[in-house]
Amino acid sequence: MVDDGTRKALSGIPLLKTKAGPRDKELWVQRLKEEYQALIKYVQNNKASDMDWFRLESNKEGTKWFGKCWYMYNLHKYEFDVEFDIPITYPTTSPEIALPELDGKTAKMYRGGKICLTDHFKPLWARNVPKFGIAHAMALGLAPWLAVEVPDLIEKGVISYQEKGSS
């Protein structure tokens, strides 16, 4: 079910060990360290294979994440804001990744621009608690969603390329 490129990307992301969410104070700090280490490794691997496609940062508590993601299509870079909150029941519950500016532009999205991950990603996440983290959500959730939805939205004329600096 997972293509070779995704399998290769996934194999380069460290698995997490600490089963802790935002309510777990000291354990959450340890989990956040693991999350950052996995994200850093994933970004390094992406850059090394010329597949760099997102930047993320979080608030001090590690409960709100935000940044940019982009998708290259026909030699044009389409860039989107990305955001999500860490659920209180994390890591049992996966984060709901949102691309607010695409809200309402595709059927594979919930209110607020949250991308639909129920059919393929959520069962996989559930089988891999607590080993999967934010980097895995990006690799197995957002990346495939962008690969399917962005070209479709472009072909339908729902989104169009904008030069940097133009509005």
Curated annotation (Swiss-Prot):
Keywords per UniProt: Ubl conjugation pathway
One GO term (biological process): response to endoplasmic reticulum stress
Annotated Pfam families: UFC1
GO molecular function terms attached to this record: UFM1 conjugating enzyme activity; UFM1 transferase activity
InterPro entries reported for this sequence: UBQ-conjugating_enzyme/RWD, Ufc1
CDD domains, sorted: UBCc_UFC1
Keyword hit for Translocase: no
Active site positions, chain numbering: 116 (glycyl thioester intermediate)
Entry's family note: Belongs to the ubiquitin-conjugating enzyme family. UFC1 subfamily.
Function field: E2-like enzyme which forms an intermediate with UFM1 via a thioester linkage.
Stated name of the protein: Ubiquitin-fold modifier-conjugating enzyme 1
Species name: Anopheles gambiae (African malaria mosquito)
